[in-house]
Regions:
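Buried hydrophobic-core signal for structured, non-transmembrane domains
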Residues: 34-36
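N-terminal beta-hairpin/loop module of FHA
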Residues: 1-31, 86-88
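Short beta-strand/loop turn elements enriched in aromatics
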Residues: 42-51
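Residue-level detector of flexible, active-site-proximal loop/helix-junction positions
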Residues: 10-13, 52, 60
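C-terminal boundary/linker segments immediately following FHA domains
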Residues: 6, 38, 49, 57-103
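Short, well-ordered loop/turn elements at secondary-structure boundaries
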Residues: 1, 39-40
Length: 103
């Protein structure tokens, strides 16, 4: 699986994690706020117990508050909010290099 930890000063939780620094002058994003991972054609997000929380706004407008430690499946065009920052998920269709991985 591909995985990245996002935050103001993220720390890896596994040896092969990628780290994505989120610039946030207001410090609404925790140091290691959230994990995003892609495996077997699916993309998941997990909040690490951040101070200001995270949520997902689906394309239909429905918002789901993330619970610390619970992995949530993302869909294309979902908008993920971390603190006062947000980003939109764009899932690319094509060959999934992790399709042959075992659980």
């Amino acid at each position: 699986p591909l995985a990245a930890n996002l935050g103001r000063a993220p720390v890896a939780s596994a040896h092969d994690d990628r780290l994505i620094i989120v610039t946030d002058p207001d410090a609404s994003v925790s140091k290691t706020h959230l994990r995003i991972e892609h495996s077997r054609g699916r993309t998941w997000v997990t909040d690490f117990g951040s101070t200001n929380g995270s949520d997902i706004r689906a394309d239909d407008g429905q918002t789901t508050e993330l619970v610390a430690g619970e992995r949530v499946l993302l869909d294309d065009a979902d908008r993920v909010r971390i603190g006062n920052r947000s980003f939109t998920i764009s899932l690319l269709l094509g060959t999934d290099s992790s399709a042959g991985e075992r659980a």
